[in-house]
Amino acid sequence: MTKSELIERLCAEQTHLSAKEIEDAVKDILEHMASTLESGDRIEIRGFGSFSLHYREPRVGRNPKTGDKVELEGKYVPHFKPGKELRERVNIG
């Protein structure tokens, strides 16, 4: 599901809200989540899961086109860990 598909579905279910209100709310939520992660904080949504940053160590990679070795710097990447209720709901484990 894309962001626009989510907005469309919410508009269909929440007929008392305008499409603009729903779009703004979705954008605000995603922006707050991104800025929270950007500041290094963890996000926990009970029953759904948690978002955090994981550090990837520097490593030597390869350019897939040329096969040349490339030094890759260490970096932080977003990580999602599903909560127990979500795992059970989608039957992951």
Curated annotation (Swiss-Prot):
This is Integration host factor subunit beta. One of its GO terms (biological process) is regulation of translation. This protein is one of the two subunits of integration host factor, a specific DNA-binding protein that functions in genetic recombination as well as in transcriptional and translational control. Belongs to the bacterial histone-like protein family. InterPro entries: Hist_DNA-bd (IPR000119), Histone-like_DNA-bd_CS (IPR020816), IHF-like_DNA-bd_dom_sf (IPR010992), IHF_beta (IPR005685). The keyword Flavoprotein does not apply. Transmembrane segments: none annotated. CDD domains: IHF_B. SMART domains: BHL. GO terms for cellular component: chromosome; cytosol. The keyword Transcription regulation applies. NCBIfam families: hip, PRK00199.1. One of its GO terms (molecular function) is DNA binding. Heterodimer of an alpha and a beta chain. Keywords: DNA recombination, DNA-binding, Transcription, Transcription regulation, Translation regulation.
